[in-house]
């Protein structure tokens, strides 16, 4: 039996929340490719602390987006460190900026001011938990 697949230009709006280190940089590059192909509209990136604080992950995200030709996608840093447990970083493994030993240039990030309970736009949220070693509740797995 032969199956024919047709590709539709669905152009889904996407907001991604990530802790942009090496793995999430690859996820952003993949999303940039989907955006270039017209498959998604990358509306915004929000960042959390991971191997570095959320401010650095926002700078990393802005750098990757700029390299991918998407400098106008808003990037918003979340809480700079975890709320419950201390932030544990491993610069000897992930480098001082979380991108291995790539040193991103200083980048200002766009911010979105949102009143709690108010949404500027409704978009599906993509959380690359499997790619970041977290689970569905955002808990990090440690080896």
Each predicted region: which residue ranges?
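N-terminal acidic, glycine/proline-rich low-complexity segments
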Residues: 1-143
